[in-house]
Amino acid sequence: MNSQEQNARFVEWARSYDAVWWKIARLYAPAGEHEALHQDLLIALWHAAPLYRAQAKASTFIYRVALNSAMNWSRSRTRYGRRHVALDEKSAQAPSKDNESDERERQVEQLYAALATLSEADRSIALLYLDELSYREIADVLGITESYVGVRLNRVKKRLMERLGKENRQ
């Protein structure tokens, strides 16, 4: 494959999976660093794109690159003491007039907060499940068996329900 084809592939993937990049950035980076991680994920994809060999689905390859890059990024921030609590981007915005929209946004924020308390591996499984990947696809992305995906996913769901239940009671 020539460089022009590789560039076209990268641009297509970057556009098609933009929502995935943002979800992963939001899940693995503090609020003030979402943009930085998003850019790092795109750079990782740029470097990895020539390695794609169509033995797996493109989405499997893309998720694997993105999740591994995000976990490495998160570990490097923790290792070097750069992990901090940033101001929530939403707190500076004017309140919305739509109560239903506000409630939905609050629920999404609660879900992301609960997901952030999980281990990196559990966050990855939850994200892939929420993105409606099949157990087989999740197994391919993470390099584990389908049955283990089921076991881990059940544990993750229980933990999330416990954490979300505690938040709703407070």
Regions found by a protein language model. Give the residues of each.
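Hydrophobic positions on the alpha-helical face of helix-turn-helix-like DNA-binding modules
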Residues: L41, V65, I125-A126, I138-A139, ...
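Acidic, proline/glycine-rich intrinsically disordered inter-domain spacer in sigma factors
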Residues: M1, E89-A116
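A short, charge-rich alpha-helical start-of-domain segment used by transcription regulators
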Residues: M1-L27, G32-E35
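Arg/Lys-rich amphipathic alpha helix in sigma70-family domain 2
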Residues: L51, L67-V85, R104
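Short amphipathic alpha helix immediately N-terminal
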Residues: T117-E137
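Sigma70-family region 2
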Residues: S3-Q4, L27, A31, L42-A58, ...
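DNA-recognition helix of helix-turn-helix
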Residues: L67, L142-E167
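Structural recognition of an alpha-helix C-terminal capping motif at a helix-to-coil junction
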Residues: A36-I43, A56-N68
